[in-house]
């Protein structure tokens, strides 16, 4: 009888949060697995998971940087924080700079980076620096999460080096990150400090294993002069609560037209697709909302504001939460 009681108590301890009471990001997280599925971890289990992952910290966390310009638009030139490395590249201090940071399981050659690079170079002369952080390709999501602060610090150090030794302007600098890459961008901004990074764009900043109530450990509005978030899979792979000073909610921010309601990856990736289109076409009209709950509920009226999602002028005029109507296929923006 005692054995049965013990087994019942053990089972109760394991199922700490009943299924019907699980709130993603509040009392636990649905953490992505390598096969695309999600596994629930309550707060205790998540803490144990992170502790196990931290036991392997100290291993290599290589971060490399590849420069693309009008002179080399398709073949990135690796640059290091060394005088000759930068001088032997096509880096031009008179051109604005864009850092692009991939998320979990990504590489610098991924289509996300290719599309964002092409989008900016189609606009004119830019230094587009694509970041490759090797620990992102870990099979275990948690081990990549553990690498985020270190990767972000290295990106921040590179930004400082280019600013201090090669005249890169911080006033025209934008750092763009997707998913986990958004938080790498946040740590880069924290490393540079004092909101000296001009703009950070968080493309559906990852939520699993990040707490909204701990902005010092995620991308936050304090990491740059202006932080913009484009939130497309809120409450699942991305945050639902506003991350940026300007927080944009395409289709209400949870699921995207043309994506299955169960295909979180599709909605998560749409943030990249929308951003590329915003850079090249500036066609995402927005409706200002009283708060993010109204944006999620699509209860913001029908009057378009003067703000365009993803516009590079937003830093000087945008604050608040915006609902963004979108189409189910390209062009996704509804403003011509």
Which residue ranges define each predicted feature?
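Glycine-rich nucleophile elbow surrounding the catalytic serine of serine-hydrolase chemistry
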Residues: 176-187
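Catalytic His-Asp charge-relay segment
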Residues: 225-230, 247-248
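Active-site nucleophile loop of the alpha/beta-hydrolase fold
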Residues: 201-209, 231-235, 253
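Flexible, membrane-associating and regulatory peripheral segments of lipid-active enzymes
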Residues: 2-130, 137-147, 156-170, 193, ...
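Conserved hydrolase catalytic core segment
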Residues: 190-197
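The conserved beta1-alpha1 loop
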Residues: 101-105, 178, 204
């Amino acid at each position: 009888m005692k054995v049965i009681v013990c087994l019942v108590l053990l089972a109760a301890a394991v199922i700490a949060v009943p299924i019907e009471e699980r709130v993603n990001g509040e009392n636990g997280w649905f953490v992505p697995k390598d096969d695309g599925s999600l596994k629930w971890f309550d707060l205790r289990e998540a803490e144990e998971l992170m502790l196990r992952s931290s036991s392997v910290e100290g291993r290599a966390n290589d971060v490399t940087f590849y420069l693309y310009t009008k002179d080399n638009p398709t073949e990135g030139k690796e640059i290091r924080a060394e005088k000759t490395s930068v001088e032997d590249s096509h880096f031009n201090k008179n051109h604005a700079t864009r850092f692009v940071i991939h998320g979990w399981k990504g590489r610098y050659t991924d289509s996300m980076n290719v599309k964002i690079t092409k989008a900016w170079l189609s606009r004119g002369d830019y230094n587009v620096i694509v970041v490759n952080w090797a620990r992102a390709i870990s099979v275990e999501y948690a081990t990549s999460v553990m690498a985020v602060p270190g990767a972000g610090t290295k990106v921040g150090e590179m930004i400082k080096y280019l600013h201090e030794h090669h005249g890169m302007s911080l006033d025209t600098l934008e750092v763009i990150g997707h998913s986990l890459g958004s938080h790498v961008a946040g740590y880069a901004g924290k490393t540079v400090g004092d909101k000296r990074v001009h703009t950070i764009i968080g493309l559906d900043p990852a939520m699993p294993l990040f707490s909204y109530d701990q902005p010092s450990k995620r991308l936050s509005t304090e990491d740059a002069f202006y932080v913009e978030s484009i939130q497309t899979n809120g409450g699942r792979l991305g945050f639902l609560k506003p991350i940026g000073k300007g927080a944009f909610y395409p289709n209400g921010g949870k699921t995207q037209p043309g994506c299955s309601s169960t295909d979180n990856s599709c909605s998560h990736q749409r943030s990249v697709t929308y951003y590329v289109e915003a850079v090249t076409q500036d066609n995402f009209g927005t409706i200002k909302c009283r708060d993010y709950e109204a944006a999620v509920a699509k209860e913001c009226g029908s009057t378009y504001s003067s703000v365009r999602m993803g516009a590079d002028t937003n830093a000087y005029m945008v604050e608040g939460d915006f609902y963004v109507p979108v189409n189910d296929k390209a062009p996704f923006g509804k403003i011509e």
